[in-house]
Amino acid sequence: MAGLRARRGPGRRLLVLSTLGFCLMLQVSAKRPPKTPPCPPSCSCTRDTAFCVDSKSVPKNLPSEVISLTLVNAAFSEIQDGAFSHLPLLQFLLLNSNKFTLIGDNAFIGLSHLQYLFIENNDIWALSKFTFRGLKSLTHLSLANNNLQTLPRDIFRPLDILSDLDLRGNALNCDCKVKWLVEWLAHTNTTVAPIYCASPPRFQEHKVQDLPLREFDCITTDFVLYQTLSFPAVSAEPFLYSSDLYLALAQPGASACTILKWDYVERQLRDYDRIPAPSAVHCKPMVVDGQLYVVVAQLFGGSYIYHWDPNTTRFTKLQDIDPQRVRKPNDLEAFRIDGDWFFAVADSSKAGATSLYRWHQNGFYSHQALHAWHRDTDLEFVDGEGKPRLIVSSSSQAPVIYQWSRSQKQFVAQGEVTQVPDAQAVKHFRAGRDSYLCLSRYIGDSKILRWEGTRFSEVQALPSRGSLALQPFLVGGHRYLALGSDFSFTQIYQWDEGRQKFVRFQELAVQAPRAFCYMPAGDAQLLLAPSFKGQTLVYRHVVVDLSA
């Protein structure tokens, strides 16, 4: 028994000592001061402040009561979304002398109490317009001494009560992207320290606050692909009939003249009807006395005139065009002189003659043979100064100008455009008081000529090897020239009013265009490009504000 008690003695003492020690610990802990708040190794912390150096990320193990955080010389470059959301009471945030290059859209989300934000001496060159989203209490913001070249529009909109802003020390590029800032500085109640432009040269060292808004030319235009018609075509002619907008396309590959209708709801061109035409080169719609006619010019099998019957809602053949007179049509032009309707056909055959037809009561009748044996390629009707003229281009001689004689009721040869020995297409336009001709050439440069009162003079040559089509057109106050080629992409030129010349504006990926057609469709301004080898493309003209 004594031995048994001897063996249990040490164990019982250990148990007693352990119990006593635990009680003492409880007593001591009851008298110990509050526990030091958690703090990452790279930081110095108090209950409500943290100062961090060389941190590898935004510290997470910080007191939740922290209201002031400083990050210096951080070893990371990106501040990610929600990086400070674990510090909802933060009022002061200083991110100075770091290597930050990117700040996420919602980096400061959840900091509804933040009043002071300093992001200085970093490598930030761009910010998102949503960078400061959620900072509804921010009063002081500094972005000084970064690499900011621009600022997105409305970046400061979420900062309702911002009173002080510092943007000094940034290499601001004072182009259209900064125009909004100039406007904002003129109307804001925020105090902003003077900031200066680093570029462009004309604004270098100019104070941003003093830049005149009129110096910013920020409105430009663009042609964007709007609709693709999955078939080749060689001509396109828009027309209005019964208050609806249509488009007639010559499709020799499909053996048809295809009629499309503009859908004002879907804002697209839709299939409407077809006229059989095995070798169509041009489908010319004409609305005469409220009746719709389509002149179908074909290389083979004769050319015809069709009439739209609204009762049967179909096209019916109205008459033939004399195949002995029109052998190989290449272009059609319709026009009106002194109340009479005419159409002219350019004949490109060696034995053909360009011919003029006139509407009389119930059909079109031959009126005049203009130009025989010259392989004509294109026609352009010009009605200026009360003197109707018809210009005929040819692959074998210089373009010929005909003027309408009211006494003879015929076109009379007036002269030649001697500056161009041959031309595939001829178009005209007016700019101010001046009249111009545009002539495309398959071999050699296309020409822009200006009428000088007694003759044409060349004002510009445009490289255009392989060109069979060109078209000047006006959209609002913007004048353009579309110049196609069989060997390269289509070039869009824009008229420079100051230089009185076309300057290269845009390139369109159109293969072997055979025509260009401008078609306003409601508020959509469309450019159609029928292609001989590929799809027919529809581009939309849009206005772009570079300051947006």
Curated annotation (Swiss-Prot):
BP GO annotations: exocytosis; regulation of exocytosis
EAR repeats, residue ranges: 222-264, 268-310, 314-361, 363-406, 410-453, 455-497, 501-543
Localization annotation: Secreted; Cytoplasmic vesicle, Secretory vesicle, Synaptic vesicle; Synapse, Synaptosome; Cell projection, Axon
Keywords (A to Z) from UniProt: Cell projection, Cytoplasmic vesicle, Exocytosis, Glycoprotein, Leucine-rich repeat, Repeat, Secreted, Signal, Synapse, Synaptosome
Keyword Membrane: no
InterPro entries: Cys-rich_flank_reg_C, EAR, EPTP, Leu-rich_rpt, Leu-rich_rpt_typical-subtyp, LGI_related, LRR_dom_sf, Quinoprot_gluc/sorb_DH_b-prop
Subunit-structure text: Interacts with STX1A.
Protein name according to UniProt: Leucine-rich repeat LGI family member 3
